[in-house]
Amino acid sequence: MVQLRKLLRVLTLMKFPCCVLEVLLCALAAAARGQEMYAPHSIRIEGDVTLGGLFPVHAKGPSGVPCGDIKRENGIHRLEAMLYALDQINSDPNLLPNVTLGARILDTCSRDTYALEQSLTFVQALIQKDTSDVRCTNGEPPVFVKPEKVVGVIGASGSSVSIMVANILRLFQIPQISYASTAPGLSDDRRYDFFSRVVPPDSFQAQAMVDIVKALGWNYVSTLASEGSYGEKGVESFTRISKEAGGLCIAQSVRIPQERKDRTIDFDRIIKQLLDTPNSRAVVIFANDEDIKQILAAAKRADQVGHFLWVGSDSWGSKINPLHQHEDIAEGAITIQPKRATVEGFDAYFTSRTLENNRRNVWFAEYWEENFNCKLTIGGSKKEDTDRKCTGQERIGKDSNYEQEGKVQFVIDAVYAMAHALHHMNKDLCADYRGVCPEMEQAGGKKLLKYIRNVNFNGSAGTPVMFNKNGDAPGRYDIFQYQTTNTSNPGYRLIGQWTDELQLNIEDMQWGKGVREIPPSVCTLPCKPGQRKKTQKGTPCCWTCEPCDGYQYQFDEMTCQHCPYDQRPNENRTGCQDIPIIKLEWHSPWAVIPVFLAMLGIIATIFVMATFIRYNDTPIVRASGRELSYVLLTGIFLCYIITFLMIAKPDVAVCSFRRVFLGLGMCISYAALLTKTNRIYRIFEQGKKSVTAPRLISPTSQLAITSSLISVQLLGVFIWFGVDPPNIIIDYDEHKTMNPEQARGVLKCDITDLQIICSLGYSILLMVTCTVYAIKTRGVPENFNEAKPIGFTMYTTCIVWLAFIPIFFGTAQSAEKLYIQTTTLTISMNLSASVALGMLYMPKVYIIIFHPELNVQKRKRSFKAVVTAATMSSRLSHKPSDRPNGEAKTELCENVDPNNCIPPVRKSVQKSVTWYTIPPTV
């Protein structure tokens, strides 16, 4: 027997010419007849046309035994479904009238090689036998009983069994319609051209399972397959489709061996292997009932209740038997099953079956014992685990649990598909003939196959039954989840369906302990917003999360990109947002102090100017040089005004005024002071040499010189306007800190630090020159035209600006650059103006207002007096020890009359000096 099985397996795999195979099969058929003593059971129903049936009535037996325990659901339910369908068809006057369908139903014992041996029964009638040499003992030729001719086969169940049988049936052109085989390989019309099925292939099922896994957010799963065509091809399809879809990785693929010595140890080892990838909690299963039951038991022994997330194929479907005593480990399992409906007529039929009315089913007594857990008194009972006697009065559904097996509908549809094909064939070939005509008997399987592929009728579920060119049914699946908690009716719950696309009701799903949140099955948890994935080589579903830093944002899952120049990342770094625009506000502490000082200075300047205008003809005002005083006060006023321009909101007009007035106020002030100190210096220097008055010392000349100095500043500003017109910009570099949250865009005029210094540079040059003259005239008697106050003013101003430069440039890289530089510049200009105003004009205003008695005209001096004073000053400066109790008190008349100048008296200077009165010149 073992050798026969091996030979059968080789024959189905090797390609022999049909004639050779037929000769070999003749011998095999004879051998098979001899095996009927070994497995004599089969169901025979007489009819005009006989259909074959292959069902897994029993499970696989242990080593050396072909058949094991009876399969109540997958075996008996399905077998009875065929008998029920035959009864319905034979009683239907509109389907195959005057033709009775018979059957020859065999047990495959869930084993492909055993099924192949059994299927040889179907081809016996087609094998021609040479009996010329055969004689009976009396010398007469024997009379052979011709076996029934099987025109088509319903089955088998397992894909590996169907493949093995299909290889034989195609040689004899016997059409085959399977009710459960879903292996993708059976869609190959070149190898399995006589094979059809009323269930969709696993390629559709695998696509549906991939869609389910992705819909649940799982990207890292393991696969588990029973050894054989169904399991291995199913996993192969799932793996291929998942790779094509992308975003789904297979942690490991585990195969359950068909032949195993110790089942418990093997399944415990499989569970341990699955736990090697703990993050891969989802397990996609393409396995038979027994393997499913064993794997659940092993998971329970490993105390992994709630860890694994099972995704079962249609071999699991909505079956109860594999879950018996393992309901807790199966909690939350998602299963798929070809779309079906409960056939109510079958329920009534099956629950009415008894030992008395179902004698045609040779395995029904064995089913009765297993179903009711009792022992029949008839001989041949196989029930050894109980002493309870069966009464025969038990009833299915009352004394035992009953639920219609998931493939019953498809068994019925397969029988009806064969019947419809025979019906159309009978109408075409036997139009005027009652029953099966000779043409139909001789038509052959190829013609019947053509009719099978063209059937189209509403099946038992109300859905169309049809086949494509490969013999496959369209893909329609129901999706279930096994739920036991928080439900009044524990069991499978319909949660969706798949017909070319997935429809999944996630809100109806629940997991262990009634949890509604979908548990993860990912290699790495999703990255947080603002992080990118860095995949690991070889495992695209495993990654490390790297945060986008600096001014980067998360462009997509894998990439961080820099924000545009004027933007920064948002709070969670999933996009960019505009950088806030800032300017120096009036209410800012950085602006309040300069504005306050400027307002005080403006008020003081206006007060001084008003006082001078009011007392314009008084001696003090006249002696201070009225023309240059008003020019100087104007410059001081502009120095205060620039504070408001520097703080005002930048626009083109404001920026234009900034350029003009930034250095103009200082330029006017220091141009006037320089003219004054230069005049004093020239007068005293000229007095040392001769009594001739120097040139350009009149008020008009002084104004002309001052205007010339100021015009240089204005010329530079106009050139600046021409080369670089005023404009406003938003400077993002100035406040682009390391922390993007602190980044700011500064709205400002298009003026660089260098341009500011250049604009002030000319004024600083005037200031330095004026300081030099102040130093040179430091020896002039203090009453001679403010030489000493001007000197103190310039010294103080230099100190202010020496402090300004390092602060201004030292904060160029500071985040507070806008505030510090603006405040420093405005305060420096305010201080410079205040120093000049305070030292040069406040004493005069004090005398004018509070001591008018001192505001009287003093003696006017001619240039001769100036010369004498200059000579005196020179000598006193060389002989400080000769000064009597301090410096000589002298006064330089503001309006020296050159016509009254007399040559200087060259004589020794006594301790007392006699001054000559010179008539005043107005």
Curated annotation (Swiss-Prot):
Residues 616-627, 676-702, 776-788, 851-922 are cytoplasmic. The chain crosses the membrane at residues 591-615, 628-648, 655-675, 703-723, 754-775, 789-810, 826-850. It is a multi-pass membrane protein. It is found in: Cell membrane. L-glutamate binds at residues 159, 180-182, 230, 314, 407. Disulfide bonds join 67-109, 249-541, 374-390, 430-437, 523-542, 527-545, 548-560, 563-576. Keywords: Cell membrane, Disulfide bond, G-protein coupled receptor, Glycoprotein, Membrane, Receptor, Sensory transduction, Signal, Transducer, Transmembrane, Transmembrane helix. InterPro entries: ANF_lig-bd_rcpt, GPCR_3, GPCR_3_9-Cys_dom, GPCR_3_9-Cys_sf, GPCR_3_C, GPCR_3_CS, GPCR_3_mGluR7, GPCR_3_mtglu_rcpt. The keyword Signal applies. Pfam families: 7tm_3 (PF00003), ANF_receptor (PF01094), NCD3G (PF07562). GO terms for biological process: adenylate cyclase-inhibiting G protein-coupled glutamate receptor signaling pathway; axon development. GO terms for cellular component: plasma membrane. GO terms for molecular function: glutamate receptor activity; group III metabotropic glutamate receptor activity; protein dimerization activity. Residues 35-590, 649-654, 724-753, 811-825 are extracellular. The keyword Ligase does not apply. Its main location: membrane. Glycans are attached at residues 98, 458, 486, 572. Residues 1-34 form the signal peptide. PANTHER family: METABOTROPIC GLUTAMATE RECEPTOR. G-protein coupled receptor activated by glutamate that regulates axon outgrowth through the MAPK-cAMP-PKA signaling pathway during neuronal development. Ligand binding causes a conformation change that triggers signaling via guanine nucleotide-binding proteins (G proteins) and modulates the activity of downstream effectors, such as adenylate cyclase that it inhibits. Belongs to the G-protein coupled receptor 3 family. Homodimer. Interacts with PICK1. This is Metabotropic glutamate receptor 7. The gene is GRM7.
